[in-house]
From Swiss-Prot:
This is Oxysterol-binding protein-related protein 3C. GO terms for molecular function: lipid binding. GO terms for cellular component: cytosol; plastid. Pfam families: Oxysterol_BP. May be involved in the transport of sterols. Belongs to the OSBP family. GO terms for biological process: lipid transport. Residues 47-61, 370-391 have a biased composition (Basic and acidic residues). InterPro entries: OSBP_sf, Oxysterol-bd, Oxysterol-bd_CS.
């Protein structure tokens, strides 16, 4: 068993690579691109003058800033730069990593369908399509803010979901998240790891993602591919996620293996995803194909991976309408995440929405966003010094560190488990308060801090 790329000598994907399948080939797309056909994006992997000019028009890098950061970044080549480099606010988006974690819930109805599905293989089609759907949002090239230790993000009013995420560690940076509705439970512990390669950076999704489908108690485990950010400083920045995504049904042993094609010149292969749902006996049952920025489809297949006679390709997911010319390439759902429409009553003061640097950037005030970001970082350093002086440790509020260590392709990760206290908090908040309006919520002062006025500690 393996990815389609590893099975090129047989089955449905052999037809793809030989050039006569109904999905076409990367070669034909490249030729079409040379001929000037519309719809093909010409990608220069190394960047170029035109790309640099396009980035400059976005207001991200001035020439003097670009040169200065290039000189600074050279000494970090080969290093994990997750939290060791202070970056200018001009390259940030008005969202934190905790909020970005919630973007995977946009198409949560696919998990509802997976829970209701009786077919164990089709169930994996729904669930893996849900996992793919977030990659449209992941292609944004703006950097989200690193959460402050103890920062949280809450979301309600979407698909019956209650979502909570919390920054549980600062060094190394780690976040934990939990979401639940009547159909599923979602849990994630994330410890992103990076490697600077000069003008590009690899982002390794070190973490553990589990989905429990409530109807049958099925537990799904997700291992996503790495992400590559190209032309970080010079050229037009773009994002790719080449490699395998594997979702395993830990209850039955069935799994789906999807291969994200790497992007080549003229955009060949970019966005394409192909793979199979396998039984526990490693026999292909359903083939899947599509583009992570558009749609996914599936079709039952035989033991050789060929479509079964009398069946047809069926769409399982497609991208919802997105805003045109959005400043940060946000989807409508991303705007909902930032809004107070999805905020619960008695919003926690540690919530990312009311973080002053994020909010200032959202309002277009880069100068204030930069100064607020600096103030928060200085306060966090002061808290760390106070914590060390007192001989104390930070304890997350909504998640508990377990003894479990989970291996990943990019290193081990300590697992944080949702402790259930947020449910109790929400029940109390909703029963004891009237609904707050947006003005009331905006008046809350951002407070993720462990200590009070640390200058007097």
């Amino acid at each position: 068993m393996g990815s389609p790329k590893k099975n090129e000598n047989k089955g449905f994907f052999a037809a793809m690579t030989s050039g006569f399948s109904m999905f076409g080939t990367a070669v034909s797309r490249s030729v079409n691109g040379v001929q000037g056909n519309e719809g093909v994006e010409v990608i220069n992997p190394e960047g170029g003058k035109e790309d640099a000019e396009e980035e400059a028009q976005k207001g991200r890098w001035k020439d003097e800033e670009r040169d200065s950061y290039w000189k600074m970044m050279q000494k970090y080549i080969g290093s994990d730069i997750t939290s060791m480099v202070t970056l200018p606010v001009v390259i940030f988006e008005p969202m934190t990593m905790l909020q970005k974690m919630a973007e995977i819930m946009e198409y949560s109805h696919l998990l509802d369908q997976a829970d209701e599905c009786e077919d164990p293989y089709l169930r994996l089609v729904y669930a893996s399509s849900w996992a793919i759907s977030v990659y449209y949002a992941f292609q944004r090239t703006w950097k989200p803010f690193n959460p402050i230790l103890g920062e949280t993000y809450e979301m309600v009013n979407h698909g019956g979901i209650s979502f909570i995420s919390e920054q549980v560690s600062h060094h190394p940076p780690m976040s934990a998240g939990h979401a639940e509705n009547e159909h599923f439970i979602y849990d994630i512990t994330s410890k992103l790891k990076t490697k600077l390669l000069g003008n590009s950076v690899d982002v390794y999704p070190v973490g553990r993602t589990r989905v429990t489908l409530k109807k049958d108690g099925v537990v799904l485990d997700l291992v996503p591919p790495l992400t590559k950010i190209h032309n970080l400083i010079f050229g037009r920045t773009w994002v790719d996620s080449p490699g395998e995504m594997v979702m395993t049904n830990l209850t039955t042993g069935d799994k789906v293996v999807l291969y994200f094609q790497p992007c080549g010149w003229f955009g060949s292969g970019r966005y394409e995803v192909d793979g199979y749902v396998y039984s526990a006996a490693e026999e292909p049952k359903i083939m899947m194909t599509g583009k992570w920025n558009e749609k996914m489809s599936y079709q039952p297949c035989d033991a050789e991976g060929e479509p079964l006679p009398g069946t047809e390709l069926k769409e399982v997911w497609h991208l919802a309408d997105v805003p045109k010319n959005d400043n940060f390439q946000y989807t409508h759902f991303a705007h909902k995440i930032n809004s107070f429409d999805t905020a619960p009553a008695k919003l926690l003061a540690s919530d990312s929405r009311i973080r002053p640097d994020r909010y200032s950037l959202e309002q277009g005030d880069l100068s204030k966003a930069g100064s607020e970001k600096h103030s928060l970082e200085e306060r966090q350093r002061a808290e760390k010094r106070t914590r060390e002086t007192k001989g104390q440790k930070f304890t997350p509020r909504w998640f508990d560190l377990t003894d479990e260590i989970t291996p990943t392709p990019w290193g081990d990760i300590e697992v944080y488990q949702y402790n259930g206290k947020y449910n109790e908090h929400r029940d109390t908040a909703e029963s004891s308060s009237s609904a707050s309006n947006e003005t009331d919520l905006k008046s809350i002062e951002f407070n993720p801090w462990q200590y009070g006025n640390i200058s007097t500690e």
